[in-house]
Every structure is written in structure tokens, then in C-alpha cells.
Amino acid sequence: SAASDVYKRQIHKGRNELRKMEYGGREYVVKSFHRPNIINRFVYGIFRPSKAKRSYDHAELYLKIGVGTPQPVGYFNVRSGLLFDKSYYVSCLSTCPYVYNDLFRRKFDYEEEVLREIGRVTAVLHEHGYAHKDYGRENILFQKTPEGIKLEIVDLNRMFVGTIGMKAGCKNFERLPATPQMHRWMAEEYAKARGFDVEKCFELMVAYRSTQPGKIDNLY
């Protein structure tokens, strides 16, 4: 059967679940979104696109504007009559071996390149009017390649769409822990790409980050 040809391994289980699957010699990630409450089951069943559909649509959009994300494959919604039940989003497995948080776990001799690329890519998103609403330390993947730094952004179901100015743009970095030097590199690249003042962007990023919980060593 087809099921017997699929190798599955759980890689994350929390509010939602991630499983790595191998099929036909290729590796995929399947994200299953938890069943919402009864009111939202009705809303998602009739009026709103599911989180899986939004993830798929946003991934297509990211790739269209040149922002990296694992290649989307598809999504599947499960219903019970008019009520929405669960949804699943499938993408190819990323080849990027590291996440942003790894910058605090080990030393990278190309750390500056990674942070500058994050600043540049975030600017591309904001210039197009898109802001990732879960822009955290586990959702930015990276890899050093002969062509430069490869970034892939994941967990795309929640996204703001609209005009993003300097303050809102710098606030979007607030969930990323960073030393002053790390903020400096991101701010320089972000400001350059958007035509903003570097010092102002740096000050805003530091200020917004200072209000956030989840510090590393109570510092960053």
C-alpha cells in the first residue's frame, strides 16, 4: 500500500505537530494544525481559509517575490459536514541545517553575513507590504552556500498585509534575540534596502527587543 511506502518521524509536537516523511525517495514535512474551538470550526468551515491553506498561499507568495521558504507541495482540509476539523500543510524538507537560535549555541565565522541577509530579506518582505507575525528564533533557517547565505523562513500562516513603515518594520525584529553588534548588522542592511536612517533603525530594534520576554542569559 502507499502507506507502507511512507517513512514518518515526528520532529515537533506542541500546539501543532510537525512530521518528517519520506516518499518516493524525497523528504517532506507535514504540519498538522490542531482542531479549533467550536465557533472557529464553523468560521473556518465556511468563511475563512484554513491555516494550512494560508501557509501554502503565503509560501507561494514568498517565492514569487524572491524570499526563501521550503518548496510548498500542497494542503488538505478535513471537514465534518459544515464544521472544519483539521488541516495539513505539506512542504519539501529544507536543506538548511541551522536556525537563528543556533547563532547563540555555537560560533559561525559567517555570522555577519547571516545577519545582514536577514536584514535584507526582511526589507524585501516589508517593501512588498508583508510582515511575518511569528518572526522568531526558530522560524528563520540558514545555510552557507558557494553563492552566499541561503535563508528560508517557515511557519507562514500568520502574516500582516499592508503598509509597513520604519517603526513597524523595526518592531518586526523584536522576537529575535541579538547582541548590539547583531542588531547593528541587521539594522544597516535593513535601512540601506529601505532608504531609512541606520542609527534610527538600530535604536528602534534595540528598544523594541528590550521589551520582550525570553532573553538569552538575561541580556539579549
Which role fits each region the language model picked out?
Residues 2-7:
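Short, small-residue-biased leader/transition segments that mark boundaries at the very start
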Residues 17-52:
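ATP-binding glycine-rich loop module of kinase domains
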Residues 32-34, 64, 74, 93:
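Residue-level recognition of conserved beta-strand positions in structured domain cores
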Residues 52, 58-61, 65-68, 101-138:
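Conserved kinase catalytic-core helix
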Residues 73-112:
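Conserved structural core of kinase catalytic domains
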Residues 149-219:
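C-lobe/activation-segment region of protein kinase-like
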